[in-house]
Swiss-Prot record:
There is a cross-link at residue 308 (Glycyl lysine isopeptide (Lys-Gly) (interchain with G-Cter in SUMO2)). It is found in: Nucleus inner membrane. This is Torsin-1A-interacting protein 1. Residues 216-225 have a biased composition (Acidic residues). Glycans are attached at residue 399. Phosphorylated. Dephosphorylated at Ser-309 and Ser-315 by serine/threonine-protein phosphatase PP1.
Length: 583
C-alpha cells in the first residue's frame, strides 16, 4: 500500500527514521519536494493550485535535525549512486552539537542566541592566541622603504601581524557571524518603532541599573583599547605605503574607508562576544537595550580612529601655522584700534547732536515766551486774544519736527488810528520769533514800492526774502501788504504755500492797514478776517485789469488768500506810543 511504501522509503532516508508514521490526509496524491524549510525529507502532499501548500508537522521523542538558511547546497542534490547524501557529512562538529540540543519549532523558528559558555571559550582562545603572539615576537613596525608588493605577500610576518584580528574574526562559525552582522541593523530599525518597556519597581530598577552600568563601563574601556590599537597600526602602515607609490589622494581615500570597515567589524565582534558575560551577571538585557549601546560604542570607536588618522597625517607646518596665527590676530586687533577712534568720535558727535536738538528747540521756545511776555507788559492796550493766539501759533511751529511741513504765516490788521502800533508790534513779534538766533527779522515796506513796476517789485521781494532766509534769518515782516502792486503779490505763492514753500522753517508776519478810522473791539475774529478779504479784493482786482499770468484776478486772489490767511488778528491803538518810536 501507499503507506507501507512511504514507511519503507522513510527508513532509507536521513532523519526519517525518527518520524512517526501517519496515514495520509488524502489518497491518490503524488509526492513533492520537501516544503518544511528545505532542510528535511518529510513527505508532503500535492495541493490544488488555488490553495497554498500546507506543511505537515510530525513529532517524536527526539526531534529531527533542521537547518534553515545554512544548509549546504550539496545536500539538496542527489548523489550519482541514487541515494541522498547525509546532511551530517557537511556540518562541523560544533554545528551538530548545537542542532541536537536545540528545540524543533517548524512553524515559528526563533533567533538563537549563542550560549554564554561557548562565547566565553571563543573569547578565551582569541585572547590566548593574541597574548602568545605578543610574547613570542614584539610587534614589527613597517620600515619606510616597504613597498605595497611586500605588504601583499602572504608569507610576510608583517601582514600576518597587521591582519591578525581579521583572521581571528574569520574563525568564528558562519552562523554566528551572520547573526552578529544582522542583529544591530535590524534591531536598530525595529527598536525605534517600539514602545519603551514598562517601569520596574524602584528597588529592582536600582539594582539592575548598577549592574548594567558596571558591565558597560568595563566593556567600553576594553573595546577602546583593542580597536584603537588596530586602527592606528593599519593607518600608519598604509599612509607610509602611499607616500612611495605617489597616488596620495586615491589611496588615502581607500585607506580611510578600509580603516572604517575594520574598526566597525572588530567592534561588532567584540561587543557581541561580550554580550553573554553581561547577561550572566544576573540580568538579561533585551535587544532594545543592547542595540543603542552597540551603536554608541561603534560610533565612539570610529570617531577615535578618524581623529588619530587625521593627527598622524597632519604636517608640522600646519600645527605651527595655527599656533603662530594667534599673535598675528592680536597685532591686527591692536592696529585696528586706531581706526576705531574716528568712528567713536563720529558716533559721539552724532549722539550729541541728536540729544542736543530737543534742548535747542526747548531753549528757542523759552526765549520766545520771554520776549512775548515782555511785549505783553509793554502793549497793555491789546486784546487778550492777540497774545494768546499769536503765541500759541508760533510756539507750535517752533516745537514742530524737523523738517517742518510749512512756514508760519501771521496776518495783523488795524485801522488808521492804530497804524504806529501795527508797525511796532509786527516787527517786535517777528524779532521775538528769531530772538534765539540773535538776528533781526527781514523788513519789507510796501509803501516804498507802490509806484514801481509789478515785475520789478516781484523780483526785488524775491531776492530780499531768499537772501535773508539763506543767510540764517528765519523771520520776515512785510508792511502794508495792500500797497504792493497787484501782480507783484503773486510772488508770495512761493513763500506761503502749504506744501511746496521754498522755505518751511521760517515765519512771515504780514500787515494790512484798513481805510477805516477805527476798528471796533466788539468785532470777532471771523468778522475781521472777512473785512480784510473784502478790502484786498477791491484793491487788487477791477474790471480794467487784463487776464494774464502776471496780473491779479479773482481766482488768483482766492488762491493767495488761502495761503496768507492762516491766522488773522486785529491790533488796537496804543496811547503811549510816540510817532516813529516803538515801546
Amino acid at each position: 500500500m501507499a503507506g507501507d511504501g512511504r514507511r519503507a522509503e522513510a527508513v532509507r532516508e536521513g532523519w526519517g527514521v525518527y518520524v512517526t508514521p501517519r496515514a495520509p490526509i488524502r489518497e491518490g496524491r503524488g509526492r513533492l519536494a520537501p516544503q518544511n524549510g528545505g532542510s528535511s525529507d518529510a513527505p508532503a502532499y500535492r495541493t490544488p493550485p488555488s490553495r497554498q501548500g500546507r506543511r505537515e508537522v510530525r513529532f517524536s521523542d527526539e526531534p529531527p535535525e533542521v537547518y534553515g538558511d545554512f544548509e549546504p547546497l550539496v545536500a539538496k542534490e542527489r548523489s550519482p549512486v541514487g541515494k541522498r547524501t547525509r546532511l551530517e557529512e557537511f556540518r562541523s562538529d560544533s554545528a551538530k552539537e548545537e542542532v541536537r540540543e536545540s528545540a524543533y519549532y517548524l512553524r515559528s523558528r526563533q533567533r538563537r542566541q549563542p550560549r554564554p559558555q561557548e562565547t566565553e571559550e571563543m573569547k578565551t582562545r582569541r585572547t590566548t592566541r593574541l597574548q602568545q603572539q605578543h610574547s613570542e615576537q614584539p610587534p614589527l613596525q613597517p620600515s619606510p622603504v616597504m613597498t605595497r608588493r611586500g605588504l601583499r605577500d602572504s608569507h610576510s610576518s608583517e601582514e600576518d601581524e597587521a591582519s591578525s584580528q581579521t583572521d581571528l574574526s574569520q574563525t568564528i562559525s558562519k552562523k554566528t557571524v551572520r547573526s552578529i552582522q544582522e542583529a544591530p541593523v535590524s534591531e536598530d530599525l525595529v527598536i525605534r518603532l517600539r514602545r519603551p518597556p514598562l517601569r520596574y519597581p524602584r528597588y529592582e530598577a536600582t539594582s539592575v541599573q548598577q549592574k548594567v552600568n558596571f558591565s558597560e563601563e568595563g566593556e567600553t574601556e576594553e573595546d577602546d583599547q583593542d580597536s584603537s590599537h588596530s586602527s592606528v597600526t593599519t593607518v600608519k602602515a598604509r599612509s607610509r605605503d602611499s607616500d612611495e607609490s605617489g597616488d596620495k589622494t586615491t589611496r588615502s581615500s581607500s585607506q580611510y574607508i578600509e580603516s572604517f570597515w575594520q574598526s566597525s567589524q572588530s567592534q561588532n565582534f567584540t561587543a557581541h562576544d561580550k554580550q553573554p558575560s553581561v547577561l550572566s551577571s544576573g540580568y538579561q538585557k533585551t535587544p532594545q537595550e543592547w542595540a543603542p549601546q552597540t551603536a554608541r560604542i561603534r560610533t565612539r570607536m570610529q570617531n577615535d580612529s578618524i581623529l588619530k588618522s587625521e593627527l598622524g597625517n597632519q604636517s608640522p607646518s600646519t600645527s605651527s601655522r595655527q599656533v603662530t596665527g594667534q599673535p598675528q590676530n592680536a597685532s591686527f586687533v591692536k592696529r585696528n584700534r586706531w581706526w576705531l577712534l574716528p568712528l567713536i568720535a563720529a558716533l559721539a558727535s552724532g549722539s550729541f547732536w541728536f540729544f542736543s536738538t530737543p534742548e535747542v528747540e526747548t531753549t528757542a521756545v523759552q526765549e520766545f515766551q520771554n520776549q512775548m511776555n515782555q511785549l505783553k507788559n509793554k502793549y497793555q492796550g491789546q486784546d487778550e486774544k492777540l497774545w494768546k493766539r499769536s503765541q500759541t501759533f508760533l510756539e507750535k511751529h517752533l516745537n514742530s519736527s524737523h523738517p517742518r511741513s510749512q512756514p508760519a504765516i501771521l496776518l495783523l490788521t488795524a485801522a488808521r488810528d492804530a497804524e504806529e502800533a501795527l508797525r511796532c508790534l509786527s516787527e517786535q513779534i517777528a524779532d521775538a520769533y528769531s530772538s534765539f538766533r540773535s538776528v533781526r527779522a527781514i523788513r519789507i515796506d510796501g509803501t516804498d514800492k507802490a509806484t514801481q513796476d509789478s515785475d520789478t517789485v516781484k523780483l526785488e521781494v524775491d531776492q530780499e526774502l531768499s537772501n535773508g532766509f539763506k543767510n540764517g534769518q528765519n523771520a520776515a515782516v512785510v508792511h502794508r501788504f495792500e500797497s504792493f502792486p497787484a501782480g507783484s503779490t503773486l510772488i508770495f505763492y512761493k513763500y506761503c504755500d502749504h506744501e511746496n514753500a521754498a522755505f518751511k522753517d521760517v515765519a512771515l508776519v504780514l500787515t494790512v492797514l484798513l481805510e477805516e478810522e477805527t476798528l471796533g473791539t466788539s468785532l470777532g475774529l471771523k468778522e475781521v478776517e472777512e473785512k480784510v478779504r473784502d478790502f484786498l479784493k477791491v484793491k487788487f482786482t477791477n474790471s480794467n485789469t487784463p487776464n494774464s499770468y502776471n496780473h491779479m484776478d479773482p481766482d488768483k486772489l482766492n488762491g493767495l488768500w488761502s495761503r496768507i490767511s492762516h491766522l488773522v488778528l486785529p491790533v488796537q491803538p496804543e496811547n503811549a506810543l510816540k510817532r516813529g518810536i516803538c515801546l
